Amino acid sequence: MSRSLSECIDQGRGLVPADLVLKHGRVFDLVTGELVQTDVAICGDRIVGTFGTYAGRREIDCRGRILVPGFIDTHLHVESSLVTPFEFDRCVTPRGITTAICDPHEIANVCGLEGIRYFLEASAHLVMDLRVQLSSCVPSTHMETAGAALEAKDLAPLMDHPRVIGLAEFMNFPGVLMKDPGCMAKLEAFRGRHIDGHAPLLRGKDLNGYIAAGIRTEHEATTADEALEKLRKGMRVLIREGSVSKDLHALVSILTERHAPYLCLCTDDRNPLDIAEHGHIDHMIRTAIRLGAPPLAVYRAASLSAAEAFGLKDRGLIAPGRRADIAVLDSLEGCHAALVLAGGVVADDAAFSARSDVEPVARASVKVAEIAPEAFRCPGNRAETPVIGILPGKIITEHLTAEIEPVDGDKRPDPARDLARIAVIERHGKTGGRATGFVRGFGMARGAIASTVCHDHHNLAVVGIDYADMALAANRLRALEGGFAVAAGGEILAELALPVGGLMSLRPFEEVRDALVTLREAARSLGVTLEEPFLQLAFLALPVIPHLKITDRGMVDVDRFEILP
């Protein structure tokens, strides 16, 4: 909905009525920190007039409201919302999120470039502005079996796509430091372009080396001290609050007006139930202000600083010439959007209904033979056994050990000690490999849960106490083309089909949200105490997050970057 330069000038000068005028509201000026009573004139997709009175062909009364720039989620995986980009758009844009920068590496790990192209094509049809970073680590390491592998030469044809913003989170930070040839080829190919980072707990000179590779932004800081070191060394820090990784409380002390130009907000992984119950970037804004962060710092991080960090110079302020991304709020503290404009378009049912669709990809992606209960045995001769220790609200895990005596050659789950079986089974039709181990922290007393959302290789992951229930849940996902399942006593208690790559539903986000409520209740009936058991399970298989993880190839000591014998 662009207009000619002449039209923009004339409407900005007030010589002719503007296409749209937001009347009588107060604009939160992110440069001066002032709240200013003014009309906002819009021509096509651009703001053309502020700090004055305007007439418009269409006028909306914003009396008693505060206007702020639309919010920017600077790092997320849309697939973690469990819906397609179209439903994600409908779910979060009305909350004020007008730009999102996504890394589609979940779908890319299942079907490669086809998945990235799907996101690029879909992004052209949304109400929000969805930008795509090219997935840097498919697979994330050599210690897993993904459905695809992407090298620098594979990404090169998409580098100059108008909706691409550089290279996505470079998770294989050990590969960067060890100058792995594949990592070096990607870093060289994107030299001078935006490269997003991923370096949990990396400090000192190793962090210097990682940043020197050209990496500019990073979202894995979990303490204020870690975040400050990254800021001091020139990184833009993206404060994260996802459904599992919740770092806002730990980092809110650095969210000051002094630091805000170098801080952004992101959600990384957030599902529709969490969005419905709490919110998205709007939830982060409310929470940060409630915890004492200055509103000016918070709103800068949510828009202006984010735009500048990722080179989106046309947005982030309510000012002439900027993209008309505007959230009309009840208050700065409440951050509830009464009206949202994305590129001058009101984000309402009519706008969402007017979008054209794109055929989804990666159907029938669960390629695994029927699984027998015996597949979940954990053989071993020694009693001393590595155990993944869950830290609620974190994707970092503990590397624990427990004495588990084998019985008939099998180390069995022990719910009395909160020791559940965990298994990962290759599901891309490549090796048929599987690995079993132990996890502590679910609180599970019976039954099993299974998922094909299993970062980042997205193999089939199962946690349980009873092998027969584990097999039942896993086999149910074969029939559903992937998803989530809860089983106990030989019955499926709850399920959610995710047929798009085993990652995303084809249903409206409201139905997915309701299914997650049922799944959560079913998991609790097994004794599970985690708020988000399926997302927590998904991250137990990611071998670039310390300290102990599991993939289809075995238990992974992330600190030593090797598979345990």
Swiss-Prot record:
Gene from which the chain derives: ade
A Pfam family it matches: Amidohydro_1
Protein name as it appears in the record: Adenine deaminase
Keyword Hydrolase belongs to the record: yes
Keywords: Hydrolase, Manganese
Record EC number: 3.5.4.2
PANTHER family from the UniProt entry: ADENINE DEAMINASE, N-ACETYLGLUCOSAMINE-6-PHOSPHATE DEACETYLASE
Similarity annotation: Belongs to the metallo-dependent hydrolases superfamily. Adenine deaminase family.
UniProt GO BP: adenine catabolic process
Top EC category: hydrolase
GO terms assigned for molecular function: adenine deaminase activity
Cofactor(s) required, per the database record: Mn(2+)
Catalysed transformations (reactions): adenine + H2O + H(+) = hypoxanthine + NH4(+)
Matching InterPro entries: Adenine_deam, Adenine_deam_C, Amidohydro-rel, Metal-dep_hydrolase_composite, Metal_Hydrolase
